[in-house]
Amino acid sequence: MEKDLANYRRSYEKGELLERDIPDDPYILFESWFNLADNSKNVEEANAMSISTVGKDLMPKTRVVLLKSFDPDGLYFYTNYDSVKGRDLDENPKCCISFFWPSLEKQIIIQGEVVKVSSKKSEEYFHSRPRGSQLGAHASNQSSVIPSREYLEERLTKLEQKYLKKEIPKPKEWGGFLFKPVAFEFWQGRASRLHDRILFTKKDDNWKIERLAP
């Protein structure tokens, strides 16, 4: 298998990120960029983010997860704690999250650590999900090896019968994480590959702001 991609390139000319427009708080800029993506007709699932983890095996792993909320404390997402992702974060809570919105020529890379959210918060979010998603969380022992697609569908059918007209309990191994950032990098594509890169690094209760070479 071979394919030459050397000529795959485009010029980025849709925006700029200048010091005069940068707030002191990265959360303000994050919210502004997120809202821009969320309101854009050219962006699907603005809350889709890549999460990179490294467990005790020291092998980096990246997957796309959906951001479910954010506030001044950080970013929230939910998963099966027994999944590869969950095990990695239990062994090493440091991780990296990134958002890329190609149509806006914007990217945000965030470094930080996670903590598990309260069982109450996980319960509240779990029961806000569609019923099918709740059943799916029970049917799938995430990241485990299964014999076939049919095996999964049979489990779902049995669970549908088991919880017919009943409330579906949250699986004990399912819950949320709060990702607490220590660094934000905002990337804005620019012409001639002279992109804007602004780095916020947390220092005690303040943020240090620096421009990085592209």
Curated annotation (Swiss-Prot):
Catalytic activity field: pyridoxamine 5'-phosphate + O2 + H2O = pyridoxal 5'-phosphate + H2O2 + NH4(+); pyridoxine 5'-phosphate + O2 = pyridoxal 5'-phosphate + H2O2
Entry EC number(s): 1.4.3.5
Cofactor binding notes: Binds 1 FMN per subunit.
Pathway per the UniProt entry: Cofactor metabolism; pyridoxal 5'-phosphate salvage; pyridoxal 5'-phosphate from pyridoxamine 5'-phosphate: step 1/1; Cofactor metabolism; pyridoxal 5'-phosphate salvage; pyridoxal 5'-phosphate from pyridoxine 5'-phosphate: step 1/1
Any single GO BP term: pyridoxine biosynthetic process
UniProt keyword Flavoprotein present: yes
Taxonomy, superkingdom: Bacteria
GO MF entries: FMN binding; pyridoxamine phosphate oxidase activity
Residues noted as binding substrate in the record, renumbered to the chain: R9, R10, S11, Y12, K68, Y125, R129, S133, R193, L194, H195
Keyword Oxidoreductase: yes
Binding site for FMN: R63, V64, V65, L66, L67, K68, Y78, T79, K85, Q107, Q142, S143, W187, R197
Required cofactor names: FMN
Pfam families: PNP_phzG_C (PF10590), PNPOx_N (PF01243)
Keyword terms: Flavoprotein, FMN, Oxidoreductase, Pyridoxine biosynthesis
Enzyme class: oxidoreductase
Assembly: Homodimer.
Protein family: Belongs to the pyridoxamine 5'-phosphate oxidase family.
Function as written in the Swiss-Prot or TrEMBL entry: Catalyzes the oxidation of either pyridoxine 5'-phosphate (PNP) or pyridoxamine 5'-phosphate (PMP) into pyridoxal 5'-phosphate (PLP).
Protein name: Pyridoxine/pyridoxamine 5'-phosphate oxidase
